[in-house]
């Protein structure tokens, strides 16, 4: 779809959506997003220029259907997939991608760390994906030197980052905000550093006793990104891994640096979103969202969860969806899903489905709470179908039609029950929606009550 859009841009020094927007040029991607979000094209261009909205769209991802992440657009959901040294293969990851897209993932991150050829699995995912693909390049940087931190050089990091851009990755998590002076602040935490990328860079800094190379070479990374229109997803290496560690000095020190890096990227006209926690008590979620907006000049916020309790292994998709809905309500632009396997193992296809549906609910609830135009239309349509016992319409409008139909049919599988004015909960005699009271009857009752009040 995008080949004809991209062709005139080839060879230019800066092909980012932000660069075009700041120069007053409405790209085809901006126009596409405007129609998708039912917003004026001029607003999309203005928000991209300001940095409050991003359109992750690498010029080498030609089958991409552009989408937006930002406060002006719908709250989005990301799904993580990826092979590990202990499980999965390329075909399984491609199937997870297709399943994620089927159940509504707005973006997908390939977090493969080994067990497969990382370049091949990434290329296969990008070729099959109509949604933006994100990656974490430090994983492959470490894998490229067979896990030897002492052999990992600054140039190795940049080489892998550019390789991901060349393949068509739309956004990359860059852990540039973790500084060597932040590391002592981790003392006193229960779970220390829980970010894999952050852990790799912490080890690198401790081993070499040098500053984070992603920070010192940040301008070089910007130069790479603007050639491909790859978007920064600034990683939160010091995100809290438990409630005890939430909103501590380590997390907030890194957040301040992430704000500095956001503005540095904008000087290059490179798009940015900022990643956030993690594990956060409910009463601290609003503070975390507001603090990010303040420190990062309202760049889109992208949070993992957050989980609101630490005692829900096997059900972390529920614990985190509670936090995600609140974060979305307060202004977070994208929610990274958590599956039932979080903290326990590599998610399979069913885990991907469970996590995505939980997060589509959270994002949709946030859009309703923020009074986005049309956000509740589908809810109202389903409610009318429910009141009229239109079972097939109810299934169709559900976030997971297959699951809704499956649960209904467990007790009433015959087709005749798709027209029945009851379900197996109340049966045919006790459903309160069966005895419908007409508006005319209610008006007559109202008149009689008013007469009684008047005569009294």
Curated annotation (Swiss-Prot):
Binding site for Zn(2+): 279, 343
One GO cellular component term noted in the UniProt record for this chain: cytosol
Residue ranges that the Swiss-Prot or TrEMBL entry lists as coiled coil: none
UniProt key word Translocase: no
Organism superkingdom: Bacteria
Gene3D superfamilies to which the protein is assigned, alphabetical: 6.10.250.620, Radical SAM ThiC family, central domain
Positions with a binding annotation for substrate: 80, 109, 139, 175, 195-197, 236-239, 275, 302
E.C. no: 4.1.99.17
Enzyme class: lyase
Textual note on the cofactor: Binds 1 [4Fe-4S] cluster per subunit. The cluster is coordinated with 3 cysteines and an exchangeable S-adenosyl-L-methionine.
Catalysed reactions listed for this entry: 5-amino-1-(5-phospho-beta-D-ribosyl)imidazole + S-adenosyl-L-methionine = 4-amino-2-methyl-5-(phosphooxymethyl)pyrimidine + CO + 5'-deoxyadenosine + formate + L-methionine + 3 H(+)
Biological or metabolic pathway of the protein: Cofactor biosynthesis; thiamine diphosphate biosynthesis
UniProt-listed InterPro entries: ThiC, ThiC/Bza_core_dom, ThiC/BzaA/B
GO BP term, example: thiamine diphosphate biosynthetic process
Binding positions ([4Fe-4S] cluster): 423, 426, 431
Cofactor: [4Fe-4S] cluster
GO MF, one annotated term: 4 iron, 4 sulfur cluster binding
Listed NCBIfam families: PRK09284.1 (NF006763), PRK13352.1 (NF009895), thiC (TIGR00190)
Protein role: Catalyzes the synthesis of the hydroxymethylpyrimidine phosphate (HMP-P) moiety of thiamine from aminoimidazole ribotide (AIR) in a radical S-adenosyl-L-methionine (SAM)-dependent reaction.
PANTHER family given in the database record: PHOSPHOMETHYLPYRIMIDINE SYNTHASE, CHLOROPLASTIC, THIAMINE BIOSYNTHESIS PROTEIN THIC
Family according to the record: Belongs to the ThiC family.
Protein name per its UniProtKB record: Phosphomethylpyrimidine synthase
Source organism phylogeny: Bacteria, Bacillati, Cyanobacteriota, Cyanophyceae, Synechococcales
Gene expressing this chain: thiC
